[in-house]
Regions:
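N-terminal anchoring/stem segment of glycosyltransferases
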Residues: 1-67
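Conserved donor-nucleotide/metal-binding helix-loop-beta segment in metal-dependent transferases, i.e.
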Residues: 101-126
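Conserved small/polar residues in nucleotide/adenosyl-binding loops
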Residues: 256-263
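Short acidic donor-binding/metal-coordinating loop in glycosyltransferase active sites
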Residues: 94-96
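Short aromatic/hydrophobic "clamp" motif used to bind/position activated sugar donors
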Residues: 89
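A short, glycine-/small-residue-rich helix N-cap motif at loop->alpha-helix starts
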Residues: 69-75
Length: 263
């Protein structure tokens, strides 16, 4: 491990193909989209070895971890925050896919003087920090705030990782981040993205009053994520996405196949 390394981090536990096959595909995509970065997967003891071998075969790094609770594994991907050997790291979800859309946004953030990077690309991205859509410049973070441990061995519910980020990390980076936010910086054109589980009801998402709902009602509900003076930007231009239509979208591994690396 070299001083100044850059990491893409994932947590992986259980045997659900949504996450396990997604991890394999992200290990492959990382070679193409982030060739100078290291993809690191924090994996639990219950992940099938066949998936782990495929991840390693794509050149990714595997760190084996012991799961203590139902969802403590979600926080493993935050461990580089306390490392003095890592410069930049970005936390991602195994059930979504790396893309050129996010890579160009990451590059833009890296040119800034902000310690953190946030992404919001769908109207249900309403947490202050989306656990699989943020990054940290450790050099700046450590200089300004010191070292922070975000492990949570007691995590026993699905959103525990995002709750902890809101309680411990958000107060520090609330005024020290770049946020690439599609909905904050774009006029609504056509229909918004929608996936099962969105907090925006299907009928509201596609019905009359859509523009008001997204621009006014949702904004009021989520005003905490828009602090005064926030460095918020539209996503920069990018090459086509290989999977999905927005960053952070859940991708069903049975419906998509991994793309071939570009020359």
């Amino acid at each position: 491990m070299e001083l100044g390394m850059n990491l893409i981090t994932f947590s992986l536990f259980g045997d659900n193909p949504l996450y396990c096959q997604g991890a394999v595909e992200n290990a492959n995509l990382a070679r193409v989209i982030y060739p100078e970065w290291t993809a690191r997967f924090y994996v639990a003891q219950d992940v099938p070895e066949d998936y782990i071998k495929e991840i390693e075969d794509y050149g990714a790094e595997v760190v084996r971890c012991e799961k203590k609770n139902s969802y403590d594994g979600l926080n493993w991907r935050f461990r580089p925050l306390s490392s003095l050997k890592v410069h930049y790291w970005i936390s991602r979800d195994a059930d979504s896919r790396l893309s050129w859309r996010e890579r160009n946004a990451v590059d833009e953030w890296m040119e800034s003087d902000k310690a953190a990077h946030l992404l919001r690309d769908c109207h249900n991205h309403g947490f202050t920090i989306m656990a699989g859509m943020f990054g940290i410049n450790n050099k700046l973070f450590h200089e300004r705030y010191g070292v922070l441990n975000l492990d949570n061995a007691n995590a026993n519910y699905r959103e525990a990782d995002q709750t902890l980020l809101q309680d411990k990390l958000w107060p520090l980076i609330k005024h020290d981040h770049v946020c690439h936010d599609h909905w904050r910086n774009s006029e609504i054109i056509g229909q918004p993205t929608y996936q099962l589980g969105d907090h925006v009801h299907f009928n509201k998402a596609y019905g009359v009053g859509l523009e008001y709902y997204l621009k006014e009602d949702v904004y009021r509900q989520l005003k905490e994520i828009y602090p005064e003076g926030q460095d918020t930007r539209p996503f920069p231009d990018h090459l086509p996405m290989d999977h999905g239509i927005f960053v952070g979208q859940i991708i069903d591994c049975l419906l998509y196949t991994s793309p071939s690396p570009r020359d």
